[in-house]
C-alpha cells in the first residue's frame, strides 16, 4: 500500500498562517450536512469547509478535532522523510488544469504522481497509457517527429489493449487519456552546457515539447476524430492548456487546426520516473538531475556501479542531485509544469551532511518545510518521494519504478 495525502489550497494557506484546521469524518459530514467533501475543490471546498467548521462549533458534528495546520503539515513531511510516504498531491492545482470538469473531478494521483484524470465511481477509472521520449538521443530538430510518433503509438495502444475493468475501458474509450513524457533531461542539458538554473532554456524546451505533443494529438483528431467526451470540456470551449487563442497567439498554427478538428486525447503529457527504463535506454531517469555522476546502487545480492551516460565527454557539466539545492529543482520542475497538462514525478533529495550547499550550512527541518511550501506556491501538482542523504548514503523507500 502506497498512501497519499491530498491537500487543498485552503489547507496550505492555513499552513502558511499557522492557523487552525479542523479534522472531520467525511462520512459524518455527508450524512449530517449533505456535503460530499471529497468531490469538492477550490472555492467550493473552501465555502463548504467554513460551513463544516460552523457545524462543529454548534455541536452538529461529533467526530472532529482542531489542530494547527502547520504542525500537521510538518508531521506529514516528517513521516515522508522517515518512510518515503505518504505522497503529497495538491488537489486544486490538479483540478484547475482538468480539461474535463464537466464530467467530474480528479480526486488523487497515481502511484508515481504523474498520471491522473477524472474518476467517477462505478463509471470511469483512470488508466495509465505512458511512453517517454529520450532527450539524450534526440536532436532538437527531431523532437516534433518523436512527439508525434509517441502520441500516435499511445493512441494506438488504447485501441489494441483491453483494460481489466469496465470502468477503465469506459475511460479509455471516452477520454483517451495518454501521457507522453521525457527522460534523459540531465543528459540533454549536460551535452549543451546548460544547468538546471537555466529556467528560460528549460521553459523553451518544454514549451516546444508541449506544442508538438498537442499538435500530434490534433493531427490525429483530423485523421480519427476527437475524443468522444470533448463537448463542454475546456477543449470544447476552445481552450488549450487553459488558454484561448487570443491568450496564446504564438500557437496560431496549432489553434487553426484545433478549432476545426478538435483534439484526440483529453490528456496528452505526463512525466514518469523512468527509473528502470532509463537504464535500458542508457540515459538519466526522467527530468531530475542524477543522484551522483558515479555511485554504487544496492540491487538484490550486491552493488551495481552506475555512471551518467556521457561521463567522459560531458562529466563536468552534470549536476548531482545530492549536492543541488532543492529549491533549484522545484523551480526547474515548475517551469516544465506550465507546459505539461498532467503531472511530473518529482522527488526531493536533501543532503544532511554539513557544508554541502554552502560553508557552515546544514539542512534542517525548516529547509524541507520551506521547499515543500515552495513546490505548492510554484504550482506543482505533487511531491513524490522525499529522500535524505547522510554520510554519502541515500535512505529511501522504493515503490513504483516503471510499473505504473
Feature locations, PLM:
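Active-site cavity-forming subdomains of large catalytic enzyme subunits
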Residues: 1-140, 163, 167, 213, ...
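Catalytic or ion-translocation cores adjacent to nucleophile or general acid/base/metal-coordination motifs
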Residues: 1-16, 199-205, 212, 288-303
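Alpha-helix capping and helix-loop boundary segments enriched in small/acidic/polar residues
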Residues: 2, 63-67, 77, 100-103, ...
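Structural signal for hydrophobic packing residues in well-ordered secondary-structure cores
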Residues: 15-19, 53, 76-81, 134-137, ...
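Internal maturation/activation junctions in enzymes
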Residues: 27-28, 147-169, 194-274, 344-345
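A glycine-rich phosphate-binding loop feature that marks nucleotide/adenosyl-phosphate handling sites
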Residues: 27-35, 90-102, 167-179, 203-207, ...
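Function-dense linear segments that define catalytic or interfacial modules
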Residues: 80-172, 177, 182-192, 283-285, ...
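Catalytic alpha/beta core of large soluble enzyme barrels
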Residues: 116, 154, 158-159, 244, ...
Amino acid at each position: 500500500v502506497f498512501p497519499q495525502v491530498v491537500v487543498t489550497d485552503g489547507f496550505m494557506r492555513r499552513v502558511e498562517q499557522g492557523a487552525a484546521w479542523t479534522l472531520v469524518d467525511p462520512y459524518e459530514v455527508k450524512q449530517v450536512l449533505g456535503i460530499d467533501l471529497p468531490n469538492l475543490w477550490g472555492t467550493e471546498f473552501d465555502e463548504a469547509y467554513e460551513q463544516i467548521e460552523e457545524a462543529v462549533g454548534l455541536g452538529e458534528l461529533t467526530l472532529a478535532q482542531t489542530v494547527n495546520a502547520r504542525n500537521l503539515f510538518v508531521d506529514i513531511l516528517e513521516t515522508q522523510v522517515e518512510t518515503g510516504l505518504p505522497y503529497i498531491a495538491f488537489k486544486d492545482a490538479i483540478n484547475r488544469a482538468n480539461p474535463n470538469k464537466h464530467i467530474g473531478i480528479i480526486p488523487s494521483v497515481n502511484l508515481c504522481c504523474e498520471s491522473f484524470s477524472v474518476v467517477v465511481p462505478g463509471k470511469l477509472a483512470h488508466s495509465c497509457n505512458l511512453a517517454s521520449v529520450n532527450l539524450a538521443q534526440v536532436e532538437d530538430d527531431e523532437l516534433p517527429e518523436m512527439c508525434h510518433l509517441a502520441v500516435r503509438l499511445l493512441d494506438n495502444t488504447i485501441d489494441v489493449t483491453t483494460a481489466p475493468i469496465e470502468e477503465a475501458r469506459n475511460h479509455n474509450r471516452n477520454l483517451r487519456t495518454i501521457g507522453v513524457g521525457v527522460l534523459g533531461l540531465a543528459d540533454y542539458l549536460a551535452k549543451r552546457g546548460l544547468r538546471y538554473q537555466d529556467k528560460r532554456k528549460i521553459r523553451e524546451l518544454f514549451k516546444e515539447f508541449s506544442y508538438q505533443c498537442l499538435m500530434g494529438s490534433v493531427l490525429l483528431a483530423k485523421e480519427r476524430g476527437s475524443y468522444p467526451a470533448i463537448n463542454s470540456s475546456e477543449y470544447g470551449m476552445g481552450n488549450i492548456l487553459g488558454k484561448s487563442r487570443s491568450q496564446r497567439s504564438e500557437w496560431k498554427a496549432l489553434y487553426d487546426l484545433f478549432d476545426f478538428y478538435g483534439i484526440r486525447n483529453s490528456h496528452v503529457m505526463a512525466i514518469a520516473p523512468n527509473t528502470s527504463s532509463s537504464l535500458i535506454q542508457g540515459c538519466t531517469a526522467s527530468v531530475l538531475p542524477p543522484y551522483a555522476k558515479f555511485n554504487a546502487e544496492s540491487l538484490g545480492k550486491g552493488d551495481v556501479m552506475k555512471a551518467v551516460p556521457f561521463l567522459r565527454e560531458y562529466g563536468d557539466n552534470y549536476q548531482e542531485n545530492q549536492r543541488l539545492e532543492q529549491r533549484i529543482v522545484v523551480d526547474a520542475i515548475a517551469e516544465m509544469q506550465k507546459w505539461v497538462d498532467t503531472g511530473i514525478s518529482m522527488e526531493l533529495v536533501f543532503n544532511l551532511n554539513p557544508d554541502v550547499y554552502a560553508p557552515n550550512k546544514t539542512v534542517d527541518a525548516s529547509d524541507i518545510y520551506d521547499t515543500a511550501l515552495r513546490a505548492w506556491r510554484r504550482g506543482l501538482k505533487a511531491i513524490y518521494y522525499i529522500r535524505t542523504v547522510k554520510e554519502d548514503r541515500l535512505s529511501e523507500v522504493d515503490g513504483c519504478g516503471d510499473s505504473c
